[in-house]
Structures are given as structure tokens and as C-alpha cells.
Swiss-Prot record:
Keywords: Glycoprotein, Hydrolase, Secreted, Signal. The lineage of its organism: Eukaryota, Fungi, Dikarya, Ascomycota, Pezizomycotina. This is GH30 family xylanase. Disulfide bonds: none annotated. GO terms for molecular function: glucosylceramidase activity. It comes from Thermothelomyces thermophilus (strain ATCC 42464 / BCRC 31852 / DSM 1799). It is found in: Secreted. Gene3D superfamilies: Glycosidases, Golgi alpha-mannosidase II. Optimum pH is 4.0. Optimum temperature is 50 degrees Celsius.
Length: 477
């Protein structure tokens, strides 16, 4: 018995010595909780344009698998924002999103003729699952266009502008108030279905004309419409008044260019939204509002589930860095990949649905986003972190529960990394334990070893990986 005790003590001493040696040899990252940046609202995706319909056609097991990999915080990416498309089309042909008022009432002075099917192109089902099964609290509803009868071109596709806006006069009259009523009614239908729409957008890529739902708006026209939409929402019977978002421009630079004209209605809208197609996030926008990167994807590449092969546009490694650039360099408060799950063989989505086999295949793009979303939860505050070497990109966040998540993107070889809080941190902020998860060519948010002693977490960060180290306070130890 005595010899066994001695052996165990020696083994423990050897392990402690090994951990100490690794800590002394590694890079030390120091998190300063007193230096704060933006609040993080979350990470997410969309199932617009009938992608939710595709998901609903899976066998029950496939449906659950698709929902799990998107929204579960234990075995999925833990996405916390769902972006829904507000339909404008007269029917569901092709992948069109059907309108909640597909038939013209004949005049903007007549009440709209609503036709709510309790499905919303199956987006309501996905929303209900996200909210009630997985605890998602942020639903962003965004319209690509008004119904065609409200527009200058009489069509919800091919551009056109909302009748009644400055420079957009129509023989049928001024449809601005009708469109505001339409959007508010959509939110009401969701509330009646026990889903709260928290954010509401009225345009998408307003500088672009497409053969599908699209509508042109200038920045001044957007401000003009916000002056109508805001009081409409406030005077409504909605139990929760959604925050107005604007304007989902095609690129970061384009959206930044709209902010001057929007400043006159800063008190009426509360969220700036931008895409990353024509320009990527690379700077902080000059606005008092949080900024979300609400749509980005590799739209052209053939489907790949790879983490890293050659740095291709659809690889998970690329998207780990894209999100980093938006959060750290662009000061974004949220990041959304275009589509979550769908059929087809492009990288426009993160999860591939095989309709014939009834199966789903997550890509490493999903797990890259999940390395953020699983551990940087809504309400987290980005904080300062220092000490990274040339091959490491780092970002740190303090969650509302007191845990601290440190993201490490490693472009070099295996690296011993120590994570600690700055000495200025108060006693109640000090961590009591740590865990780490990594994604690379062989892992998908897989827990890896993290030793913890004297307030310092030590992790061997794999080469060409994204690793998230989480420091837990005593209550979570």
C-alpha cells in the first residue's frame, strides 16, 4: 500500500512538472477584463427561400439531426440567431417565398388581404424549434421586397421601388403605410404562433436588382420609410416591439456609405446590418448602433466539407478567419452565414441535405462558426487580450455567466498556449477551471486536454486549427 502511494505521488509530481514545463515554454495570453469592446449578440444563419421546406422533407431523424447541428450547444454549432425571409411572391413556385398578402386590395386605401398559412415557407417551424427546443432568443425577419402591387415595376422581382417614396410615384398611389402595416402584421402572426421577432428589416441589398425578390432603395429613401415604419410598430398591439434594422447592403463599404443619410433617424432604428459580398468587414462603422454581418457565403464554389486544403473560399479555415475579421477588425456584434442547411452542391450553405438518402452532412464551415457560437454566447462582451505570437490570432470575450472564452486561430505548428487573466482582475473574476475545444482537419469542436493550475490554463493548440479555451468561475467549477 505504501509503495502504491509513493508511486501515485511520484506520478502526480511528474504530471505537475510536465505541465509546469509546458507552461514555461508556451505563449502566454493575458486577458484584460477592464478593457471592453462591443457586445456580442450572437452567430447565426437563415433557412429562407424554402430551404426550411427542404429541411422539413427529411425523415424525422434527419430533421432532428439538421436542427441539432445548427442550434444545439452540446453537439452542434450552438447558433443563436435565425434570419427569416419575409415573403413577397404571389406563390411558392421555384423557391419563392410566398407573401402573407399575395393579392392586391386594389388601392393602398383598402385593407390588405392577408393569407396566413401558419407555415411561412416552413420558416415558422424552424423558428419554433430554434426558440422552444434550443433556446434561441433572436429572430431577425427581413424582407427582400414588398409585394409587387406596392412597387413601381408591379413585380416583387427585378428591382423596382416602393410606390410613394421620393422619386417613386405610381398611378396606384402611395403604398408606404401599407408596406409598414404589412411588415408589422408579419411580426404579429409570429407572436400569435409563440415566436417573438426581435429584429425587423424592410430591405435586402437595396443597391442590387435581381431576377428574384429585390427592391431598390437609396439611403435617404430608407430613412424616409423608417419614419413611417417606426411609429407603425410603436402604435401596434405587438407585445414586443422589434428593433428596426437597416439596410443589409451588399457589402460592408456600401452599408457604411448609407449611414450619413440614416443619421437623421438614429432614434428610430437600432441595428445596422451589412453583407460581405462586394466588400468584407475591415473597419468599425461610424454609428451609435450595433452592427451585424448578416449574410456571407462562398456562392460559387462546389460543395466541400473540408477544414483546410489550400485556403479555398469554402474551407472552414477560411471562415474561421472571416468571422475573426468581422468581430475584431469590423467590431461586428453578430455574424451570420447565408444558409444553414439545404440540398445542392455549392458552398452557399453549411450543412448538405441529401434528399434521396434523407441524411445531412455538416461542413467545417459550420464547425468554424460553432467554435465562436458555442462558447461566445449572446450578451458576451469582447475584451482585450495580449501576448499572441505571429502565427496566432486571438480574441477574448466575457460571457454574462462570468466565463471567459478565448479564441485562438493558429496558422503555425502545434503551440503550447497559456491563458490567464490580468493581475488587475478582481478575486471574484478569477477562474477555477478551464476546458478547451478545437476544430481542424480531424476534429469538429472536439474537446482537447486543458490543464489548469494557479489560475492559468495551459493548452496544446493544434497546428492549423481554431481552438476555444474557456475559463470558468468558481460557481461553474
Amino acid at each position: 500500500m505504501y509503495s502504491l502511494l509513493i508511486a501515485l505521488l511520484c506520478a502526480g509530481t511528474a504530471v505537475d512538472a510536465q505541465a509546469l514545463q509546458q507552461r514555461q515554454a508556451g505563449t502566454t495570453l493575458t486577458v484584460d477584463l477592464s478593457t471592453t469592446y462591443q457586445r456580442i449578440d450572437g452567430f447565426g444563419t437563415s433557412e429562407a427561400f424554402q430551404r426550411a421546406v427542404q429541411m422539413s422533407r427529411l425523415p424525422e431523424e434527419g430533421q432532428r439531426r439538421a436542427l441539432d447541428v445548427l442550434f444545439s450547444t452540446t453537439n452542434g454549432a450552438g447558433l443563436s440567431i435565425l434570419r427569416n425571409g419575409i415573403g413577397s411572391s404571389p406563390d411558392m413556385s421555384s423557391d419563392h417565398m410566398v407573401s402573407i398578402a399575395p393579392k392586391s386590395p386594389g388601392s393602398p386605401n383598402n385593407p390588405l388581404i392577408y393569407s396566413w398559412d401558419g407555415s411561412d415557407n416552413k420558416q415558422l417551424w424552424v423558428s419554433q424549434e430554434a426558440v422552444h427546443t434550443y433556446g434561441v432568443k433572436t429572430i431577425y425577419a427581413d424582407a427582400w421586397s414588398a409585394p409587387g402591387y406596392m412597387k413601381t415595376n408591379g413585380n416583387d422581382a427585378n428591382g423596382g421601388t416602393l410606390c410613394g417614396l421620393s422619386g417613386a410615384q405610381c398611378a396606384s398611389g402611395d403604398w408606404r403605410q401599407a408596406y409598414a402595416d404589412y411588415l408589422t402584421k408579419y411580426v404579429e402572426f409570429y407572436q400569435e404562433s409563440n415566436v417573438t421577432v426581435t429584429h425587423l428589416g424592410f430591405i435586402n441589398e437595396p443597391e442590387l436588382t435581381t431576377s428574384y425578390a429585390s427592391m431598390r432603395f437609396s439611403a435617404s429613401q430608407a430613412a424616409e420609410f423608417i419614419r413611417i415604419l417606426y411609429p407603425t410598430i410603436q402604435k401596434s398591439n405587438l407585445t414586443y416591439k422589434p428593433t428596426i434594422a437597416c439596410c443589409d447592403a451588399e457589402g460592408w463599404n456600401s452599408q457604411a456609405g448609407m449611414l450619413g443619410a440614416l443619421s437623421s433617424v438614429n432614434s428610430m432604428f437600432g441595428l445596422v446590418t451589412a453583407h460581405a459580398y462586394t466588400s468584407q468587414p475591415g473597419f468599425s462603422m461610424n454609428t451609435p448602433h450595433p452592427v451585424w454581418m448578416t449574410e456571407a457565403a462562398d456562392l460559387q464554389g462546389a460543395w466541400t466539407s473540408a477544414w483546410y486544403s489550400y485556403g479555398g473560399a469554402g474551407e472552414g479555415w477560411t471562415w474561421a478567419n472571416n468571422v475573426y475579421n468581422a468581430i475584431v477588425n469590423g467590431n461586428a456584434s453578430a455574424y451570420l452565414y447565408w444558409i444553414g442547411a439545404q440540398t445542392g452542391n455549392t458552398n452557399s450553405h453549411m450543412v448538405h441535405i441529401d434528399a434521396n438518402a434523407g441524411t445531412v452532412e455538416p461542413s467545417k464551415r459550420l464547425w468554424a462558426l460553432g467554435q465562436w457560437s458555442r462558447f461566445v454566447r449572446p450578451g458576451a462582451r469582447r475584451v482585450a487580450v495580449s501576448g499572441a505570437s505571429g502565427s496566432l490570432r486571438t480574441a477574448a470575450f466575457r460571457n454574462e455567466d462570468g466565463s471567459v472564452a478565448v479564441v485562438v486561430i493558429n496558422s503555425g505548428g502545434d503551440a503550447a498556449v497559456n491563458v490567464r487573466l490580468a493581475s488587475s482582475s478582481s478575486a471574484d473574476q478569477q477562474p477555477a477551471s478551464a476546458k478547451a475545444w478545437a476544430t481542424d482537419n480531424s476534429r469538429a469542436i472536439e474537446e482537447i486536454q486543458a490543464s489548469f493550475a494557479d489560475g492559468v490554463a495551459t493548452v496544446n493548440v493544434p497546428s492549423r486549427s481554431m481552438t476555444t479555451v474557456v475559463l470558468y468561475p468558481a460557481a461553474d467549477a
